[in-house]
A protein has these predicted regions:
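N-terminal Rossmann NAD(P)H-binding glycine-rich loop of SDR-like oxidoreductase domains
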Residues: 5-25
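Conserved glycine-rich Rossmann-like NAD(P)H-binding loop of the short-chain dehydrogenase/reductase
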Residues: 27-36
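NAD(P)H-binding glycine-rich loop region in Rossmannoid oxidoreductase-like domains
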Residues: 52-113
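Conserved cofactor-binding/catalytic machinery of classical short-chain dehydrogenase/reductase
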Residues: 54, 116-120, 137, 180-181
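Conserved Rossmann-fold NAD(P)-dependent oxidoreductase catalytic core, especially the SDR/UDP-sugar
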Residues: 89, 118-173
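Glycine-rich NAD(P)-binding loop of the Rossmann-fold in SDR/ketoreductase-type enzymes
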Residues: 108-119, 172, 176-177
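Active-site Tyr-X1-5-Lys
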Residues: 169-190
Length: 190
């Protein structure tokens, strides 16, 4: 049976490259993002544009209903629902350094990104419970912004092991949200 993967944030730089990598390894891939990839066409078997802050949208994209791409068929019987083998979570509300470090957009960025991650975890848990399933592997992509700023001041030692993230002192609200979401995914995995 073909392995299936869901790539969230598949329109971005890292997500689009992950889609390419998974396809080269033989996966069936569904890509999801607010926008299509800017610099090349997607290699995803199915690419869906939509807003991950919408829990109903997230509920639908988490169901793999066949390699023919049945996302747009509204009434796929439950017997055809399957969870993805793997989920790669790169999606975030992030407009670049000039956007996130101004202070004007911090609350909205934190809210939207936290909502995306809460929706993914809540809806995956519901699907797992409904299908009596718990083997979907989820990869969450964090950011170096979650480390304390003083740990990032030198280029002499670029290593940032996880144990130096605490005591927490991220350099921005974006970093705080990434740290919060890391904790969400760790807790979900218990």
């Amino acid at each position: 049976m073909t392995c299936t993967a869901l790539v969230l944030g598949a329109g971005g730089f890292i997500g689009s490259h992950m889609v390419r990598r998974l396809k080269s390894e033989g996966y069936w891939v569904r890509g999801v993002d607010l926008k299509r990839p800017e610099f090349s066409s997607t290699e995803a078997d199915e690419f869906i544009q939509g807003d991950l802050t919408d829990p109903l949208f997230v509920e639908r994209i988490l169901k793999y209903t066949g390699s023919t791409g049945n996302f747009y068929k509204q009434d796929v019987p439950r017997k055809y629902w399957n969870p993805f083998n793997e989920i790669y979570q790169f999606a975030a509300d992030m407009g670049g350094a000039g956007f996130i470090f101004t202070g004007e957009n911090d609350a909205e960025i934190m809210h939207n990104s936290a909502t995306i991650n809460l929706n993914i975890l809540n809806e995956q848990k519901k699907l797992n419970d409904l299908l009596d399933h718990n083997y979907t592997k989820i990869f969450y992509s964090s950011s170096a912004c979650m480390y304390p700023a003083y740990q990032q001041e030198t280029t002499e030692d670029p290593k940032l092991p996880e144990d130096i993230a605490y005591p927490a002192a991220p350099d921005s609200e974006y970093g705080w949200e990434k740290l919060f979401s890391e904790r969400l995914y760790l807790t979900y995995n218990r």
